[in-house]
């Protein structure tokens, strides 16, 4: 079974991320409360953090926001290297090269839920053994009247890493704004 890798100075290559995906294929999630970032489950040992931003108005921007999430453009725009084993749907896995100050880490997740409504689209993914944290994160864009909102929820154990998660959330929010402004 794959274990959490050590931070590295150089970004991982796509080949290294594909190997990380292969090494965690069929692995169990590292937490039990599947769906917790979307309010579908509870866990007493995990803490929720939420970040929301109004992106801008207009239905065309909502469609662009959905496409940016669906295609992993938001993650790439936030500075992550992304290798996924298929489209964003339940059961799909993704390996991420995540920059942290002066180092890079590999994080592997599995999509555990997809939100697909007329006025909302998004997904939640959960951590697999080759991930530096434990828990779940969701990314949902929604249309509320004339606004497009982007909400990120991270449900993880209490940790000193929270400032890094807040920084990551701000990067995702800015990346989505750039994607819809194009």
Feature-to-residue mapping (PLM):
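Short, solvent-exposed aromatic-acidic interface loops
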Residues: 127-131, 153-161
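Hydrophobic-ligand binding "helix-grip"
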Residues: 2, 101-146
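Hydrophobic ligand-binding cavity/cleft-lining segments
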Residues: 1-97
